[in-house]
């Protein structure tokens, strides 16, 4: 009987030591799941003199906010739209490819608006007399560390 009890204790200790331990992390996880906030707007039929001719652009901007943004930190999208229009109207290098123009837009928006964690700009350029093709550039840029 003692041998059977001893064997039972050995088996119990073996099972206890070899069993995996599971920790619940529900206390630290958000109750409603993770939150991702995004916003988007478009600039339609924006006229610009670039690359030696008049061009018609259609621009779609979408962006993701930083986590835990407060009400006072939300930028009014009209500010972003106006900043894009101003950058394009006063663009310094008329020879830049559209991809470079697009990279400057995303860089400017992330620099100026710290509440934005990432931004995507899709720029469509309609056919023109010199370039009879529809073209587009899509650039996504993220804040470092966000």
Where is each model-derived feature located?
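Bacterial N-terminal signal peptides
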Residues: 9-19
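N-terminal, polar/charged subdomain of small-to-medium soluble alpha/beta proteins
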Residues: 23-146
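Bacterial N-terminal signal peptides that target proteins for export
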Residues: 1-10
């Amino acid at each position: 009987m003692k041998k059977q009890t001893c064997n039972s204790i050995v088996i119990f200790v073996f099972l206890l030591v070899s069993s995996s331990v599971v920790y619940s992390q529900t206390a630290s996880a958000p109750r409603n799941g993770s939150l991702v906030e995004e916003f988007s707007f478009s600039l339609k039929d924006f006229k610009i003199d670039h690359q030696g001719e008049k061009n018609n652009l259609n621009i779609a901007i979408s962006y993701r906010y930083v986590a835990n943004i407060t009400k006072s930190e939300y930028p009014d999208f009209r500010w972003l739209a106006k900043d894009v229009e101003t950058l394009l109207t006063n663009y310094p290098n008329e020879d830049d490819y559209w991809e470079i123009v697009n990279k400057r837009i995303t860089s400017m928006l992330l620099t100026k608006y710290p509440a934005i964690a990432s931004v995507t700009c899709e720029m469509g350029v309609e056919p023109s007399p010199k370039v009879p093709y529809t073209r587009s550039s899509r650039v996504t840029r993220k804040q470092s560390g966000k």
